[in-house]
Swiss-Prot record:
EC number: 1.2.1.59
Protein name: Glyceraldehyde-3-phosphate dehydrogenase
Membrane-crossing segments per the record: none
Catalysed reactions listed for this entry: D-glyceraldehyde 3-phosphate + phosphate + NADP(+) = (2R)-3-phospho-glyceroyl phosphate + NADPH + H(+); D-glyceraldehyde 3-phosphate + phosphate + NAD(+) = (2R)-3-phospho-glyceroyl phosphate + NADH + H(+)
GO cellular component terms, A-Z: cytoplasm
Coiled-coil features, chain-numbered ranges: none
GO molecular-function term, one example from the UniProt record: NAD binding
Family: Belongs to the glyceraldehyde-3-phosphate dehydrogenase family.
Binding positions for D-glyceraldehyde 3-phosphate per the UniProt entry: 138-140, 193-194
Pathway note: Carbohydrate degradation; glycolysis; pyruvate from D-glyceraldehyde 3-phosphate: step 1/5
CDD domains, alphabetized: GAPDH_II_C, GAPDH_II_N
Keywords annotated in UniProt: Cytoplasm, Glycolysis, NAD, NADP, Oxidoreductase
UniProt source species: Metallosphaera sedula (strain ATCC 51363 / DSM 5348 / JCM 9185 / NBRC 15509 / TH2)
Underlying gene: gap
Length: 340
């Protein structure tokens, strides 16, 4: 069993912790929190071992939250640490993980040089095997890479031009916006997403633009992909529908918005309304010669969760990427084919 610690129990950390609990080959040592908020109370109610920094011990005691120990105790017990701390904090913790001889995963908010390799399970699982430090790319980059590495199986990609409509905040983030504006993110081109894709697909010609929209549900990507040889729409739909972690939303289902996608997730009984899969609007898929056009939605809170699980196996020396993906998908109910 791989013993895993999760440093940070926010949007990503709590989902990764739940995913670890579902794995047949992993055990959750515990999670860490810096403040005794509702997430800490929920972790306690779920029976998850809670670890805190030495500085916050008294605050947790005063809040009546029982802790298992301090952060260093948790790290000491683990084989792998999943760092789910806020952007930039993970790089600071790397020294701690290194000094204690632990392998660690970092999230996409960290700079690429924090790790030995940036990771996307469908693209470069093999590159992460036995590495000490792996960075799981961000939600948007995960969506881009999952799509591009899938399309690349039909015809080698020559170039990509993409527009990303980013959600303004997660549903719980009450202090973020905008609430009545569209904001270029940034106005200069390319956006950072193209550069991040190149940390995995290093030679790909890709340019992205991004805008922040006043919504909390999902991101939406609009891609124009030029491939090296002509393909058909049927070729594209076939590879998309047969690839794990990608779902098609058909026009017949009347699912035509991110709101309806999230509603389907609710109706499916998904924990926290999560959709680990990329959701492609089937009617958007169009082919003109060597160009493939499509639109898809990315659930920013959960798309990276199965990627973290696979990365845990990779750094632990599990060499069979396809098998890892199958194990993760089976344990978490992750599908392929059609959303409805």
């Amino acid at each position: 069993m791989i013993k895993v610690a999760v440093n940070g129990y926010g949007t990503i950390g709590k989902r990764v912790a739940s995913a670890i609990l579902a794995q047949p080959d992993m055990t959750l040592v515990g999670v860490s929190k810096t403040s005794p908020n509702y997430e800490a109370y929920q972790a306690q109610k779920m029976g998850i071992n809670l670890y805190v920094t030495k500085e916050s011990l008294k605050e947790f005691e005063e809040a009546g939250i029982k802790v298992k120990g301090v952060l260093e105790d948790m790290i000491k017990e683990a084989d792998v640490v999943v760092d789910a701390t806020p952007n930039g904090v993970g790089a600071q913790y790397k020294q701690v993980y290194s000094s204690m001889g632990k392998r660690a995963l970092f999230q996409g908010g960290e700079k690429a040089n924090v790790a030995d390799v940036s990771f996307s399970a469908l693209c470069n699982y093999d590159e992460a095997v036995d590495k000490r430090y792996v960075r799981v790319v961000s939600c948007n980059t995960t969506g881009l890479l999952r799509t591009l590495c899938t399309l690349n199986r039909v015809s080698k990609i020559a170039k990509v031009r993409g527009t990303i409509v980013r959600r303004a905040a997660d549903p719980k983030e009450v202090k973020k916006g905008p609430i009545n504006s569209l904001v270029p993110d940034p106005a200069s081109i390319p956006s950072h997403h193209a550069k991040d894709v190149n940390t995995v697909l290093k030679d790909l010609d890709i340019v992205t633009m991004a805008v922040v929209a006043p919504t909390t549900l999902m991101h939406v990507h609009l891609l124009d992909v030029t491939v090296s040889s002509p393909v058909t729409k049927e070729d594209v739909l076939s590879v998309l529908s047969s690839t794990p972690r990608i779902l098609l939303a058909s026009g017949k289902s009347k699912v035509s918005s991110t709101a309806e996608i999230v509603e389907v997730a609710r109706d499916m009984g998904r924990p926290r309304n999560d959709l680990y899969e990329l959701v492609v609007f089937e009617d958007s898929v169009s082919v003109r010669g060597n160009e493939v056009f499509l639109m898809y939605a990315v659930h920013q809170e959960s798309i990276v969760v199965p990627e973290n699980v696979d990365a845990i196996r990779a750094v632990s020396g599990f060499a069979d990427g396809r098998k890892s993906i199958e194990m993760t998908n089976a344990s978490m109910g992750i599908g392929k084919g059609y959303l409805v």
